[in-house]
A protein has these predicted regions:
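Single conserved hydrophobic/aromatic residue that forms the stacking wall/gate
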Residues: 1-7, 12
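Short coil/turn segments at secondary-structure junctions
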Residues: 2-3, 21, 138-139
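Short, flexible, solvent-exposed loop/turn segments with mixed acidic/basic and small polar residues
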Residues: 15-16, 157
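Flexible glycine/proline-enriched surface loops and loop-helix/loop-strand junctions
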Residues: 16-23
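A conserved active-site cap/scaffold subdomain adjacent to cofactor or substrate pockets
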Residues: 22, 29-46
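Hydrophobic alpha-helical scaffolding
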Residues: 23-27, 141-144
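C-terminal helical cap and adjacent loop that interface with cofactors, partners, or active-site loops
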Residues: 36, 57, 70-212
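Oxyanion-binding "anion nests"
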Residues: 44-52, 60-79
Length: 212
């Protein structure tokens, strides 16, 4: 993921105005969730996953890449074998310690474009989560909160029998209604906006590569 971002002139990206967060540059990435969604949602034609990164983050990653600190292959240092990326991991602060000083909000959502009742329809469903509010509740920032709460709800669906059938399944193969209702109840309320601003999935720095 990192190496595809640091060479930003080659990236597929767009700038989007996120509710309560503001305008951010977001980059097209691969994510493992796409694999099962494409398989399990009937009729889906295209799925794209975007994530935002600040310029400071990208600059730091580019510098680290330039000096070899993002390498995952072992090198010899004073007769000992070390992996640069593992060394960097040890030098960075424990992510759990960042909660008290992480401020701002996350905006996580999906834009759906399709046909309903013979007509084109577009909706944007999303959640906004505050880092400091999350820390007050569970002593963790919003990134961990928005990861842990959905997993908890999924477990609850299984334990209570709301999701129950033999075999192994991904979340999108189960009844979404009780899950979505539980998100509202357990700290991740969501909103729906009709006809949102669309995302240009193919915008690049190269004007010759551009498709709406």
């Amino acid at each position: 993921m990192t190496s595809s971002l640091v060479g930003s002139e080659m990236c597929i990206r767009d700038r989007y105005n996120f509710d309560q967060v503001g305008e951010k540059d977001m980059y097209l990435l691969h994510h493992e969730e796409i694999e099962s969604l494409a398989k399990n949602i009937p009729g889906v034609k295209r799925i794209r996953f975007f994530m935002t990164f600040g310029q400071s983050y990208l600059t730091h990653m580019k510098c680290l890449e330039d000096v070899g600190m993002l390498r995952t292959d072992p090198i010899m240092v004073d007769g000992k074998e070390v992996v640069p990326l593992q060394v960097l991991k040890e030098l960075l602060p424990d992510p759990a310690s960042l909660g008290p000083r992480t401020v701002g909000k996350t905006n996580i959502g999906c834009i759906f474009n399709g046909i309903k009742d013979g007509k084109k329809k577009s909706i944007y469903i999303y959640n906004v989560c505050d880092h400091q509010e999350c820390y007050k509740e569970v002593e963790s920032q919003a990134v961990s909160y928005t990861t842990g709460v959905p997993a908890m709800i999924g477990s609850m669906m299984v334990v209570t029998g709301l999701w129950k059938k033999p075999g192994v399944f991904n979340l999108e193969e189960m009844d979404p209604d009780p899950y979505m209702e539980a998100l509202n109840k357990f700290g991740l309320p969501w909103k729906v906006v009709e006809n949102p601003v669309s995302v240009d999935c193919y915008k690049t720095a190269d004007p010759s590569v551009h498709m709406d």
